[in-house]
Amino acid sequence: MYDIKKWRHIFKLDPAKHISDDDLDAICMSQTDAIMIGGTDDVTEDNVIHLMSRVRRYPLPLVLEISNIESVMPGFDFYFVPTVLNSTDVVFHNGTLLEALKTYGHSIDFEEVIFEGYVVCNADSKVAKHTKANTDLTTEDLEAYAQMVNHMYRLPVMYIEYSGIYGDVSKVQAVSEHLTETQLFYGGGISSEQQATEMAAIADTIIVGDIIYKDIKKALKTVKIKESSK
């Protein structure tokens, strides 16, 4: 079993987006710690299994971040289940999890399931609109969410998601200072080695996604953060 606490860098692939064989090979051979498959729009059983089968040729951990029940399937090393803490719709707190347990509860290996305390911070992102997230958050709000995740819910991961824009470093720093047990994931707008280095100095793990589809060379440079210690 892989130890996710050792992961510093994850590439996130969207099953609804095209990636060439050459670019996928470069991503999977880049020394990233893991590949995560996940997205908001058009995540289907067919495109998830197609992308999974392409990535499975490489010897690295493979994660499915669950956005709907229809695209859940066996074959992944881990299943990340987001609970969107700042959603105004209870479905995105535990509704998806409830349906997953009703459908697959009898066969789930809970050692493979990682629950993420998700906080969506970009009001203009698809994920914010889809999850009906209240993104008007102060530093104090984020600190309270961090305390909730770390001390009360005791979730293994807190994911600060800016989805498409580079986040407020001071707010991410404030969150990190309240997490003593929970692993901090950061994702959103990382498009350069400098940004990757800046966020990797704060977060335990950075997630790099959109830049893969815009500039593969810049995406690959973000893996260099693994050469330095946090």
From Swiss-Prot:
One biological process term in Gene Ontology: glycerophospholipid biosynthetic process
Chain residues that bind sn-glycerol 1-phosphate: 12, 159-164, 189, 209-210
Family matches, as CDD domains: PcrB_like (cd02812)
Family note: Belongs to the GGGP/HepGP synthase family. Group I subfamily.
Keyword Repressor in annotation: no
GO molecular function: heptaprenylglyceryl phosphate synthase activity; magnesium ion binding; prenyltransferase activity
Amino acids binding Mg(2+): 14, 40
Record's subunit section: Homodimer.
Designated name of the protein: Heptaprenylglyceryl phosphate synthase
PANTHER family registered for this protein in UniProt: HEPTAPRENYLGLYCERYL PHOSPHATE SYNTHASE, PTHR40029
Database matches in Pfam families: PcrB
Species in which this protein is naturally found: Staphylococcus aureus (strain NCTC 8325 / PS 47)
Function: Prenyltransferase that catalyzes in vivo the transfer of the heptaprenyl moiety of heptaprenyl pyrophosphate (HepPP; 35 carbon atoms) to the C3 hydroxyl of sn-glycerol-1-phosphate (G1P), producing heptaprenylglyceryl phosphate (HepGP). This reaction is an ether-bond-formation step in the biosynthesis of archaea-type G1P-based membrane lipids found in Bacillales. To a much lesser extent, is also able to use geranylgeranyl diphosphate (GGPP; C20) as the prenyl donor.
This protein's pathway: Membrane lipid metabolism; glycerophospholipid metabolism
Record's catalysed reaction(s): sn-glycerol 1-phosphate + all-trans-heptaprenyl diphosphate = 3-heptaprenyl-sn-glycero-1-phosphate + diphosphate
Superkingdom of this protein's organism: Bacteria
Cofactor(s) listed in the protein's UniProt record: Mg(2+)
